[in-house]
């Protein structure tokens, strides 16, 4: 079980309180698909992902990015039990969608870049430490059902 300090909880809650889920979700998922093009294979039903411009303008990608951020909101609300909170989602990505679990880390890295850019100087070292810890727990929970 992960131990969270009061400061870590406050930092993570503060980050989420300022997020525009639509903007940050879209930018993060688009960045992941553009920077790591092999991740596009999981989005075959999302239409044309031929180049960066089509990815950035794709409403299905934007909607899924928002959905991902709302999924992270579930982790925020269940910080003391992220593993069980994501058990079903982990199984879905493992058994049905066959997503390589390394892609969760890639998306988490892209999300961090987007949030850091948005927060600017407010994304301090202390903020990053708490944020990275949170995302590491989420990524671990999402990869838990893989064998």
Curated annotation (Swiss-Prot):
PROSITE patterns: GLOBIN. Red blood cells. GO terms for biological process: hydrogen peroxide catabolic process. Residues 3-147 form the Globin domain. One of its GO terms (cellular component) is hemoglobin complex. Coiled coil: none annotated. SUPFAM superfamilies: Globin-like (SSF46458). It comes from the Eukaryota. Keywords: Heme, Iron, Metal-binding, Oxygen transport, Transport. GO terms for molecular function: haptoglobin binding; heme binding; metal ion binding; organic acid binding; oxygen binding; oxygen carrier activity; peroxidase activity. InterPro entries: Globin (IPR000971), Globin-like_sf (IPR009050), Globin/Proto (IPR012292), Hemoglobin_b (IPR002337), Hemoglobin_oxygen_transport (IPR050056). Heme b binds at residues 64, 93. Heterotetramer of two alpha chains and two beta chains. Involved in oxygen transport from gills to the various peripheral tissues. PANTHER family: HEMOGLOBIN FAMILY MEMBER, HEMOGLOBIN SUBUNIT EPSILON. Belongs to the globin family. This is Hemoglobin subunit beta. It comes from Merlangius merlangus (Whiting). The lineage of its organism: Eukaryota, Metazoa, Chordata, Craniata, Vertebrata.
